[in-house]
Amino acid sequence: MIRYILICLILGTLLLSCDVRRKDKVADDAMQKMEQVLKDTTTVELIDTVYKFGTITEGDKVEYNFRFKNTGKKPLVISNAHASCGCTVPEKPEKPVMPGETSFIKVVFNSKGKSGHQEKSIFVSSNARPSFPDLTLLGEVKRLAQ
């Protein structure tokens, strides 16, 4: 019986030590991936993050260019831009924005079927660190007289 317990303890110790090595390898792999991501990142400075379009009439469209500058040393790649509502359509630059260059994300808000206070958010995915801030359109839509 003692022999059986001793064998179980030895096997348990071996299994636990293998698991520690596995966790170390996983941690090392994660660290390498993080270092690679950080090598490929850049920084961005937003010239404007909020646009207040005032009061418009239902059915009007608002178009605005949110401007930004790549302040890092690597090209800024915007992989995705999407809005909180289908009535708002962002258009991102198709080409990378080189260091020192200024560019914009064009946003069009269609007020058809909308009324009252409007707050639309635009979310941008890029290789910027810290991440690209959310963009916001604010305003009022007056309902058409029926």
Feature-to-residue mapping (PLM):
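A short beta-strand micro-motif common to beta-rich folds, especially ectodomain repeats
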Residues: 118-126
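Positively charged n-region of N-terminal signal peptides that target proteins for export
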Residues: 1-4
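Short strand-edge motifs at loop-to-beta-strand transitions and within beta-strands
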Residues: 51, 101-107
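C-terminal motif of bacterial Sec signal peptides marking the signal peptidase cleavage site
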Residues: 14-17
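Post-signal-peptide N-terminal segment of Sec-exported extracytoplasmic proteins
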Residues: 36-77, 125-138, 143
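Short, surface-exposed loop/turn segments at beta-strand-coil junctions that are enriched for proline
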Residues: 110-115
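Surface-exposed binding patches on compact interaction domains or structured appendages
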Residues: 73-101
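Short, low-complexity, disordered segments immediately C-terminal to signal peptides
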Residues: 19-35
